[in-house]
């Protein structure tokens, strides 16, 4: 039974990041055939966007060193997008060679994380992004931008809202079609979410990406929906974190998100039973239980 709440959208796009943001943080290398089946299962469950992999140098993210082989194995379905993360122009070159049609770039809202993750300053990171976005747009690619540490980081504490907006507006100004606001270490709370989204002056080109470190991901998501956001990033079984932020724990679990949205009468186009089955299947291959509360509860009957 669904119970609507006033002021929420009729439909939400769940942007699945498990194959990229989830698997990049695994200690063991997941075989490429498992990754390909994982992505195919997600598409079969109704996902219209599945972030497939990353072209970050294998030295930094060895778990995704098989990006080219994986893309070659994908059974691409009509109506499903398979974006990839691209860190720089070399990564873009590889993506273009493989016929990718959508990419994502990854920015920082704080100086310290920009230095640790990108080896750049807050300002100089744009020297890297500008040619990537410009060339991608010239080739007809869609470009999405992630901004990490939007609510706080382990070194600088709370991130000033105006600092996040300044970074985000510049990325949108480059031509990115969407900005995903990331709570990389999970310190955000619903009021903070409302304030940040409101500071952008409109939610139309915003998405949210919450980690559940302090158990706030679903509450933060509800606040974002009330503020007008209609795209939410999530990861199968809550897998993932950030290789460069030790205090970052798992992503918002796709199954938990869909359970809440279904209860609110919000359409997603997703089959929860298939999502749970996929989460259980993946957990068996990763050698540990799914961290999704919904998957755990349904497993107990």
Residue map of PLM features:
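Catalytic cores and adjacent flexible loops of soluble metabolic enzymes
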Residues: 1-301
């Amino acid at each position: 039974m669904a119970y609507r709440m006033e002021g929420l959208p009729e439909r939400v796009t769940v942007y699945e990041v498990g194959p990229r943001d989830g698997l990049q943080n695994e200690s063991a290398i997941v075989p490429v055939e498992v990754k390909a089946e994982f992505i195919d299962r997600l598409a079969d469950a109704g996902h219209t966007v599945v972030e497939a992999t990353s072209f970050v140098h294998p030295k930094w993210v060895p778990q995704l060193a098989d990006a080219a082989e994986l893309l070659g194995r994908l059974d691409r379905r009509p109506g499903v997008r398979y974006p990839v993360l691209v860190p720089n122009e070399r990564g873009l070159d590889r993506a273009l060679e493989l016929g990718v049609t959508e990419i994502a770039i990854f920015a920082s809202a704080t100086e310290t994380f920009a230095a640790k993750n990108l080896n750049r300053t807050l300002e100089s990171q744009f020297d890297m992004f500008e040619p990537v976005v410009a060339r991608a747009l010239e080739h007809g690619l869609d470009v999405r931008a992630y901004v990490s540490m939007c609510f706080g980081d382990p070194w600088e504490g709370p991130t000033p809202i105006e600092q996040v907006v300044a970074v985000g507006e510049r990325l949108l100004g480059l031509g990115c079609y969407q900005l995903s606001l990331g709570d990389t270490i999970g310190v955000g709370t619903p009021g903070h979410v409302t304030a940040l989204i409101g500071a952008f002056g409109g939610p139309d080109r915003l998405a949210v990406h919450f980690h559940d470190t302090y158990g706030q991901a679903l509450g933060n998501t509800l606040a974002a929906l009330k503020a007008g956001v209609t795209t939410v990033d999530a990861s199968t079984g809550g897998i993932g974190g950030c290789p460069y932020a030790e205090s970052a724990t798992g992503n918002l679990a796709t199954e938990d998100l869909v359970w809440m949205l279904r209860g609110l009468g919000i359409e997603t186009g997703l089959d929860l039973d298939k999502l749970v089955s996929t989460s259980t299947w993946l957990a068996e291959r990763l050698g540990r239980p799914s961290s999704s509360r919904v998957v755990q509860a349904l497993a107990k009957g």
